[in-house]
């Protein structure tokens, strides 16, 4: 936990130091109560270097949460230990590296998916906003979740560990709140057909709500 926390803090510190506008955008929690999408200079390109750094930081966060999830799951924990009673450091590093790379590819892969399906639903202008708002919401939620788990570990040690069910409920609730938030945000910010918007979000965000933490 300590090593992973230092790594995440270092990465976000670099963005905060050299790209403060990007950092402020992705950690602007007040957006959850502001249902208006505004273009910003940091949103010009999803492949701008600071945005890539933030997506990579998000990939690390989700891989750490996935690692914690796997430790709590008896079947996945047994696979991680590979027959040994103690989890080896190299196995943990390999797991996190694989999950981080996979998550990074999937996050940018969803940008392509957004382009395809916004075109199918005739709401092409939504592809980039959907990507940025998804990344922003995910960074905020998984930062809170991860550092919450870190504080619990730091204060209580191994004496108390949140159950797999508790973490799953939190993640599933987040994804459900997110789809409702996206609907009202995009409805208020763009001139869209409400039926097309609802169908689009139900299709793309619905699968996220359905699978929840299992996607990690």
What are these regions (language model features)?
Residues 2-120:
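Core alpha-helical transmembrane segments of integral membrane proteins
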Residues 71-216:
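Generic detector of multi-pass transmembrane helix bundles and their immediately adjacent loops
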